[in-house]
């Protein structure tokens, strides 16, 4: 028994950081050998992925599904698969390095208004990076869905670190916006904001919209300080004008997908794309987001070392909002209260209950936080007292950087690796409002337990709630609907678009459970 305690003690007290763990490792482009007998039958996920890629160039695209102990129960619709293949062909015809793209950018540079809507089949929407990695991923998925619905080409601003994190998602072309794109220089000189003269919301407020004179581009402003006029871009009447504009430039930090369902034209297509409404991000993320080989090496090595032998895996993601941030006892108490109340972790016993007839189960807890104290304290709790179930509890935290360092390559790579590791757990607890958490549980097809935001530095009661949907929350949606639904609470227009559990009076979320 003493030997067992010593071994467990030695395992639990080590919290490995990615920087120390992986700097000692050489990137192995082949990863571990996988026996043919262990390969899943459907590495293309029901046709969600195309086979038109070289596997070695991006190991995670197909190999990441070997790590799942069971396949996702959510399969893409045939219509979604068909639309993705159609989009890939359109992107190949209109993407960077094509004649169509060159002609479109030349027209954009001339900055001439159009008298008609005839601009060919190639129209574009440019995504500008903003805020942390979680925000960037949920907005990329949102903008890509909008591109599918409107038959536009998504181009991604790569002045940040997108290409260091993610592989190209479309075969035979690129989604990266060329650095000589004429409007990029403008962003450095002035910046895109509500005061930008071709901001759609500003043009509406200034009565500057003329249906017979089409601007060469519009800027869509959809961040936390957006006005109601900015949020009208998804409405049917507004889309009839916006659809004629060849170039859209969008800056957003929000998952605006729920609002797209409020447009009847979009809704007709969305219902066919996603019969299971809570699967939007789950499918789009598995299609779009494939970590680079460097990031995937981090994921596979950490998983093999610490998670692969567990009987059960629990992910806990802790984000402390506001100032000061850091380790707080009331947050630690909240995590323990939630996990024990929901039977995710066992209670503590004063004396050990050893069942010699069968070996104890191993439950591994993966903690993602900027602060190491949460995993250290959780470790110490189970070292000090045995679990009521007799399970062995091991706690691991891949990194603890204390400060968010957005746009630092190594920091963002670790963050992406941890999102994927969390998505590979069996159950997950995440902080409410956290886009890092949204990406992790939705990517894994998991319905999370959401930790309520503490008020006045006290532990909430109840500490958490089980979400009925695995979709992210749209934090700053329009407060009302469009046209006929103007003035109606946007969370009460459709039975499947309702307020979020972690933002009861503001956010919107998609649900299948009516």
From Swiss-Prot:
Gene Ontology molecular-function annotations: fucosyltransferase activity; galactoside 2-alpha-L-fucosyltransferase activity
Glycosylation sites noted in the Swiss-Prot or TrEMBL record: 185, 210, 355, 377, 456
Main location, first listed in the record: Golgi
UniProt pathway annotation: Protein modification; protein glycosylation
Biological process (GO), any one: cell wall biogenesis
Tissue: Expressed in root, leaves, stems and seedlings.
Ranges that cross the membrane: none
Keywords from the named record: Cell wall biogenesis/degradation, Glycoprotein, Glycosyltransferase, Golgi apparatus, Transferase
Top-level division of the source organism's lineage: Eukaryota
Coiled coil ranges: none
Compartments it resides in: Golgi apparatus
GO cellular component assignments: Golgi apparatus; membrane
Enzyme nomenclature, EC number: 2.4.1.-
Family membership noted in the UniProt record: Belongs to the glycosyltransferase 37 family.
Biological function: May be involved in cell wall biosynthesis. May act as a fucosyltransferase.
Protein name (database record): Putative fucosyltransferase 10
Organism: Arabidopsis thaliana
Organism placement in taxonomy: Eukaryota, Viridiplantae, Streptophyta, Embryophyta, Tracheophyta
Gene symbol of the encoding locus: FUT10
């Amino acid at each position: 028994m003493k030997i067992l305690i010593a071994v467990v003690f030695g395992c639990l007290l080590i919290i490995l950081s990615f920087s120390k763990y992986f700097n000692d490792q050489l990137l192995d482009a082949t990863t571990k050998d996988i026996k043919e007998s262990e390969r899943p039958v459907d590495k293309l996920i029901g046709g969600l992925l195309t086979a038109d890629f070289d596997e070695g160039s991006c190991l995670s695209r197909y190999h990441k599904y070997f790590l799942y102990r069971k396949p996702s129960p959510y399969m893409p619709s045939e219509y979604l698969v068909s639309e993705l293949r159609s989009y890939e062909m359109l992107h190949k015809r209109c993407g960077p390095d094509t004649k169509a793209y060159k002609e479109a950018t030349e027209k954009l540079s001339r900055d001439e208004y159009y008298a008609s809507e005839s601009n060919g089949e190639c129209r574009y929407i440019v995504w500008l990076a903003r805020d942390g990695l979680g925000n960037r991923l949920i907005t990329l998925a949102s903008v890509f869905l909008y591109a599918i619905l409107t038959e536009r080409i998504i181009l991604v601003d790569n002045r940040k670190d997108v290409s260091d994190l993610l592989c190209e998602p479309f075969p035979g072309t690129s989604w990266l916006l060329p650095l000589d794109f004429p409007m990029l220089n403008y962003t450095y000189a002035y910046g895109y904001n509500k005061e930008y003269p071709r901001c759609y919301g500003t043009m509406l407020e200034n009565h500057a919209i003329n249906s017979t004179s089409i601007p060469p581009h519009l800027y869509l402003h959809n961040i936390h300080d957006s006005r109601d006029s900015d949020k009208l871009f998804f409405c049917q009447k507004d889309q009839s004008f916006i659809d004629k504009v060849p170039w859209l430039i969008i800056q957003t930090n929000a998952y605006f997908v729920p609002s797209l369902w409020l447009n009847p034209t979009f809704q007709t297509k969305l219902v066919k794309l996603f019969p299971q409404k809570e699967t939007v991000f789950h499918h789009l993320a598995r299609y779009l987001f494939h970590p680079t080989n460097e990031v995937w090496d981090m994921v596979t090595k950490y998983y093999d070392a610490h998670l692969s032998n567990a009987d059960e895996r629990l992910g806990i993601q802790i984000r402390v909002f506001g100032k000061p941030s850091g380790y707080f006892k009331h947050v630690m108490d909240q995590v323990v209260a939630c996990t024990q109340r929901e039977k995710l972790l066992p209670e503590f016993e004063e004396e050990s209950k050893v069942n010699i007839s069968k070996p104890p189960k191993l439950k591994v807890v993966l903690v993602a936080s900027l602060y190491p104290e949460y995993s250290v304290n959780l470790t110490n709790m189970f070292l000090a007292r045995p679990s009521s179930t007799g399970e062995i509890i091991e706690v691991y935290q891949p990194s603890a950087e204390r400060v968010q360092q957005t746009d630092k390559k190594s920091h963002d790579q670790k963050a992406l690796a941890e999102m994927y590791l969390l998505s590979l757990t069996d159950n997950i607890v995440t902080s409410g409002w956290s886009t890092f958490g949204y990406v992790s549980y939705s990517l894994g097809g998991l319905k999370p337990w959401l930790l309520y935001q503490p008020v006045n530095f006290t532990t909430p009661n109840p500490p958490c709630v089980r979400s009925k949907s695995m979709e992210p929350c749209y934090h700053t949606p329009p407060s009302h609907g469009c046209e006929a639904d103007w003035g109606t609470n946007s969370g009460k227009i459709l039975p499947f678009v309702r307020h979020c559990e972690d933002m009861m009076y503001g956010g919107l979320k998609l649900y299948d459970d009516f």
